[in-house]
Amino acid sequence: MKCPRARVDIFKREIKTRELEPTEKNVYHGLTGPISLPPHNPVSIRFQEMVSWRLRSAVIGFFLLVSSTSGSSAASIPSAPTPDATRESPTGEPHRDRALSTETPTPEPSRDGGSTPEVLHVVTGPVRPRDRDPILERLAEILAETHSLHQLLTPGTGPREDEDEVFARALAAAEIAIGSVADRVMWKATLSCMLVVTSLVFAGVALWVIVARHGHFRVIPHERSRDWSPGL
């Protein structure tokens, strides 16, 4: 039985005496002579064996699904409910569009001498409006604050207050306006950014899987000259 050192010498001798063509691919010239490398990276081969065509199809399909739904979900903005223009009145005639009506809706008087703002008389009779949209409620608050500020700043229209009160009301109106816009926009922008990042990640994974399947990920050292030596 030969010692390990003798086996090392045998391997070195085989490497030095190996005859290879100068134009052969995957040849690395080192200190001991030309060494033939495997045609593919072993890591890439194992990865190709693990990844099947079903997994690649699932990744590509999921990426297409996410990219198609990102635009639609980001563009879907809840709108205020619109009244039903085709609903029939008690007399049997359909309601006309409120926007085309020239009559001004008047509040229905109540028994105590006041008015009931929830019930409005239109062309075809009394109609109770539906629940108002939160955006419209916030806009009504902003208009009310603006009207109060106009009364405070305009002489002769109301009691004058000190500058601190005016500044506080103006700051409150600005906070209401900014909050109403931020609450409606920030979550949509965040959702859109998350969907775009997810789509890019899945696109990169799908592209990497496809390219790795064709064997483009190979770690092959650059071929050096046969005349290379440590002294150069």
From Swiss-Prot:
Compositional bias (Low complexity): 71-84
Transmembrane stretches, start-end: 166-182, 195-211
Keywords of the record: Membrane, Transmembrane, Transmembrane helix
Main subcellular location of this protein, as a coarse class: membrane
Topology in membrane: Multi-pass membrane protein
Subcellular location as annotated: Membrane
Annotated region described as Disordered, given as residue ranges: 71-121
Keyword Membrane (UniProt): yes
One Gene Ontology cellular component: membrane
Protein name: Putative membrane protein ORF8
Organism (species): Ictalurid herpesvirus 1 (strain Auburn)
Taxonomy of the source species: Viruses, Duplodnaviria, Heunggongvirae, Peploviricota, Herviviricetes
